[in-house]
């Protein structure tokens, strides 16, 4: 029932802290949630029998006004990776290429391959900055998207 090509992807293995080394890449913090967060979660739990309102319409309206852009130019999600994955999945086809500097966000190659496209990883400069010349040189007729992360700029 599932696409057989998806079987080649590795299972996610969460990182673990080791002794005095703390793994920060899992986006976990050592402290429990603040009491105000727990109270908000408790209130929200009482509404889990209802469909959520998709798209955060109030936030979208306010951001649209603040930024001076049309509402349909905004995408709201719980994290940037959801938006990146959806954008790649909606725009890429088998045989397309997506360029991004490497080393970068570990999920980029997975998102690209899940869409049926091929990742094209370009090198960073010696000081781990965006190698813009390498990105430009990698552009071909098959290039469908280029992902640039602010961390490298």
Enumerate the language-model features and the residues they cover.
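Conserved acidic residues
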Residues: 22, 96, 144
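Structural motif
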Residues: 99, 145-149
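N-terminal "arm"/small-domain region of PLP-dependent enzymes with the aminotransferase-like
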Residues: 1-50, 148
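Hydrophobic residues at beta-strand termini and immediately following loops
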Residues: 24, 51, 77, 122
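Conserved PLP-anchoring active-site segment centered on the Schiff-base-forming lysine
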Residues: 90-111
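PLP-dependent aminotransferase-class I/II
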Residues: 117-144
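Phosphate-binding glycine-rich loop
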Residues: 56-97
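Conserved small/polar residues in nucleotide/adenosyl-binding loops
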Residues: 151-153
């Amino acid at each position: 029932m599932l696409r057989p090509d998806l079987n080649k992807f590795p299972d996610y293995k969460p990182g673990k802290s080791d002794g005095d080394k703390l793994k920060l890449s899992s986006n976990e913090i050592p402290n429990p949630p603040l009491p105000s967060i727990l109270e908000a979660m408790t209130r929200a739990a009482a509404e889990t029998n209802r469909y959520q309102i998709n798209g955060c319409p109030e936030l979208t309206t306010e951001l649209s006004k603040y930024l001076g852009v049309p509402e349909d130019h905004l995408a709201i999600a719980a994290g940037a990776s959801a938006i990146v994955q959806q954008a790649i999945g909606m725009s890429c086809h088998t045989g397309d290429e997506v360029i991004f500097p490497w080393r970068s966000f570990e999920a980029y190659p997975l998102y690209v391959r899940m869409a049926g496209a091929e990742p094209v990883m370009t090198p960073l400069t010696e000081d781990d900055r965006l190698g813009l010349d390498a990105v430009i040189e990698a552009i071909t007729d098959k290039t469908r998207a280029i992902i640039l992360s602010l961390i490298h700029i």
